[in-house]
Curated annotation (Swiss-Prot):
Hexamer; dimer of trimers. The keyword Metal-binding applies. Belongs to the homogentisate dioxygenase family. This is Homogentisate 1,2-dioxygenase. Keywords: Dioxygenase, Iron, Metal-binding, Oxidoreductase, Phenylalanine catabolism, Tyrosine catabolism. The gene is hmgA. It comes from the Bacteria. It comes from Sinorhizobium fredii (strain NBRC 101917 / NGR234).
Length: 453
């Protein structure tokens, strides 16, 4: 006999979800025939008795290339999904500016995965902020979160007015049901929920816990990076991004809407589901992306290029070439460079780097960086291959090698990432991380050959 949780998981998994390909397209979709008006946005009376409503992700007068809005045709207008809010608290979800009081000194930091929950937690309850950067009130910067949970958001719904959420599952697949449709998101995939978009999260599959990472982007929205001399192809190709088709709930049962606004949390009880959009059209919408479709480029003769070539998505700042936050992927790839130290080189950086590992092993760290783990290398703090990685790359035969079984990523921002107290006191913090470089001995002996013994 299947238990209630197993039946739920099987029912969700049996859904064959449909998607529309493309990045930033002007989409149109309806879940009932004739629900989408033709030739206009706001008819005097919408079919099916629906309400027309615009969701704006940019100012009305933003340039055409960055102007984002969608028209939604819904069972009730969003004013009916609100009421008299009451303040609530998610004590582990922090927002910039947030300078925490803790005893941990400055340094390069690394953590093992979050421990599994001891009680029942849904997606929202399982979010733990590791770092914050910038200022949500001026809409710049980001926060890096980890999550771990083991229960569905059944009648709980949420939207974030502070920024868009880039969700990176590491263990356990998710069904993310948004106002504009459903997305199934497995490890090695990502999804993005735009600022202000209502959603809930359910579990797919059988795991003890569902775990992953979130980048909360307070600033300009994520977009595809310019390819420059690379040309029209490779990296993340627009056709591989998938936006969900319209889907809705028409249920009248006690539900709870929760909102994050300027770092504070609020809740209101309503008597129906707010996921009631029957049809929509526009370019402000959620999407998912399979990281395995990322087409990397790299050095094919010598040297190691800058990690910016691995940028999947970038959220620009007001300064050209300087990101508010980048989402960078280190995927499987061939290493073929001649007379070259092939791993990422030793580095001090104006940008601040938060890293995670989805599966496998990261080529610059032979040991200690595990799936579900995290590392933080803040601005101008030195980092690079550990001793074992250096020895292997320095003495190994330089034949073509496929770097396989790896999927690491980075949230990189122009702002220093401030550690939360939770992160500073987390039991999985590796006290010995700094020792991974202790074996890098002096090889200079005054001769051109050096001491490579």
């Amino acid at each position: 006999m299947l238990g209630k949780a197993e039946k739920r998981s099987e029912a969700l998994a049996a859904e064959a979800l449909a998607y529309m390909p493309g990045f930033g397209n002007d989409f149109e979709t309806e879940s009932l025939p004739g629900a989408l008006p033709q030739g206009q946005n706001s008819p005097q009376k919408c079919n099916y008795g629906l309400y027309a409503e615009q969701l704006s992700g940019s100012p009305f007068t933003a340039p055409r290339g960055t102007n984002e809005r969608s028209w939604l045709y819904r069972i009730r207008p969003s004013v009916r999904h609100t009421g008299r809010f009451a303040k609530i608290d998610y004590p582990h979800w922090k927002t910039a500016p947030h300078i925490a009081e803790h005893a941990l000194a400055l340094g390069q930091l690394r953590w093992n995965p979050l421990p599994e929950p001891t009680g029942e937690l849904n997606f929202l309850q399982g979010i733990r902020t590791m770092t914050t950067a910038g200022d949500v009130l001026t809409q710049v910067g980001m926060a890096a979160h980890a999550y771990v949970f083991n229960a569905d958001m059944v009648d709980d719904y949420f939207f974030n007015a502070d920024g868009e959420l880039l969700i990176v599952p590491e263990m356990g697949a998710l069904q993310v049901f948004t106002e504009l449709g459903k997305m199934d998101v497995a490890p090695s995939e990502i999804c993005l929920v735009p600022r202000g978009t209502m959603f809930k999260v359910a579990r797919l599959g059988e795991e003890k816990a569902w775990r992953g990472y979130i980048c909360e982007n307070y600033g300009a929205k994520f977009t595809l990076p310019d390819r420059g001399p690379i040309g029209a192809n490779c990296l993340a190709n627009p056709r591989d991004f998938k936006t969900p088709v319209a889907a809705f709930e028409d249920k009248e049962t006690p539900c709870r809407v929760q909102v994050k606004w300027c770092g504070s949390f609020h809740t209101v009880e309503i008597g129906h589901s707010p996921l009631d959009v029957v049809a929509w059209h526009g370019n402000y919408a959620p999407y998912k992306y399979d990281l395995k479709t990322f087409s990397p480029v790299g050095a094919i003769l010598f040297d190691h290029p800058d990690p910016s070539i691995f940028t999947v998505l970038t959220a620009p700042s007001g300064e050209e070439g300087t990101a508010n936050v980048d989402f960078v992927l280190f995927p499987p790839r061939w290493l073929v460079a001649e007379h070259t130290f092939r791993p990422p080189w030793y580095h001090r950086n104006i940008m601040s780097e938060f890293m995670g590992l989805i599966h496998g092993r990261y080529d610059a760290k032979e040991e200690g960086f595990v799936p579900g783990g995290m590392s933080l290398h803040n601005m101008m703090l030195a980092h690079g291959p550990d001793t074992s990685g250096f020895e292997k790359a320095t003495n190994g035969e330089l034949k073509p090698v496929k770097l396989d079984n790896t999927m690491a990523f980075m949230f990189e921002t122009r702002f220093p990432q401030q550690l939360t107290r939770f992160a500073a006191e987390l039991e999985t913090l590796q006290d010995d991380y700094i020792d991974c470089w202790a074996g890098l001995r002096k090889r200079f002996n005054g001769t051109p050959e050096g001491d490579w013994s």
